[in-house]
């Protein structure tokens, strides 16, 4: 049996090849797959569960098929789809899980994060994150008409891309001290996250013991997946 972890697909109607690759990925799962964890930025933007764009509904249908075949599906918010709600998760046969969830991964506790909250040196982004994760701010946004929300999402996405182009690469990566801190706080020696688009396996030391941070890849020219089983962990990629 195995458990799969993916993130940062950034599904959007302008990137149909990524959606096709994701559907192919779902169809390839066998009865050996126990669970699929999607750790944020599944969608490139999320303006509410009431969005009438056909893409989210098509994705929900495919996820529901996988869930009906016996695979548990878990969704975590990212910095692009933090408004994703329980209504959509239920339609997709999925369960929303909080950032910082610790799971038992074949006898090994693993901390799951999207990863943006580890980038503490990017102070401008951290302030923005605090604002948009505020329940009152979110409620005000969701009360607006779909067209207004869609326009705001496009504006925020364009601003983010422009700002990131001017930032040093180092501040957009995780802060090593923060990684160790959250792992110590959670009492784990394994952290799995996405967000940075820098897939890799990083050995480190936490409380004097060997530990590991695994970074999931973004789906662009390649698909990425962490495949976990009782026999080990494998970070896999393939061409799209």
Swiss-Prot record:
Its main location: membrane. Pathway: Glycolipid biosynthesis; lipid IV(A) biosynthesis; lipid IV(A) from (3R)-3-hydroxytetradecanoyl-[acyl-carrier-protein] and UDP-N-acetyl-alpha-D-glucosamine: step 4/6. Binds 2 Mn(2+) ions per subunit in a binuclear metal center. GO terms for cellular component: cytoplasm; extrinsic component of plasma membrane. Hydrolyzes the pyrophosphate bond of UDP-2,3-diacylglucosamine to yield 2,3-diacylglucosamine 1-phosphate (lipid X) and UMP by catalyzing the attack of water at the alpha-P atom. Involved in the biosynthesis of lipid A, a phosphorylated glycolipid that anchors the lipopolysaccharide to the outer membrane of the cell. Belongs to the LpxH family. This is UDP-2,3-diacylglucosamine hydrolase. It comes from Cellvibrio japonicus (strain Ueda107) (Pseudomonas fluorescens subsp. cellulosa). The gene is lpxH.
């Amino acid at each position: 049996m195995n458990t799969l972890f993916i993130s940062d697909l950034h599904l959007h109607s302008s990137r149909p090849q990524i959606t096709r690759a994701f559907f192919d990925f779902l169809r390839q799962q066998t009865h050996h797959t126990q669970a699929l964890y999607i750790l944020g930025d599944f969608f490139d933007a999320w303006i509410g569960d009431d969005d009438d764009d056909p893409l989210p509904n098509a994705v929900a249908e495919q996820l529901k098929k996988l869930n009906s075949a016996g695979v548990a599906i878990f969704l975590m918010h990212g910095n692009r789809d933090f408004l994703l709600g329980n209504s959509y998760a239920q339609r997709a046969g999925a369960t929303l899980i909080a950032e910082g969830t610790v799971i038992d991964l074949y006898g090994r506790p693993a901390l799951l994060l999207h990863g943006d909250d580890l980038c503490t040196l990017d102070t401008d982004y951290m302030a923005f994150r605090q604002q948009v994760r505020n329940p009152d701010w979110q409620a005000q946004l969701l009360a607006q008409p779909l067209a207004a929300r869609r326009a705001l999402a496009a504006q925020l996405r364009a601003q983010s891309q422009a700002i990131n182009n001017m930032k040093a690469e180092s501040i957009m990566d995780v802060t090593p001290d923060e990684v160790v801190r959250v792992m110590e706080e959670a009492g784990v020696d394994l952290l799995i996250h996405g967000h940075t688009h820098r897939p890799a396996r990083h050995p480190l030391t936490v409380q004097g013991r060997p530990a590991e941070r695994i970074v999931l890849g973004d789906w662009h020219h390649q698909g990425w997946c962490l495949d976990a089983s009782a026999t080990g962990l494998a970070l896999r990629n393939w061409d799209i």
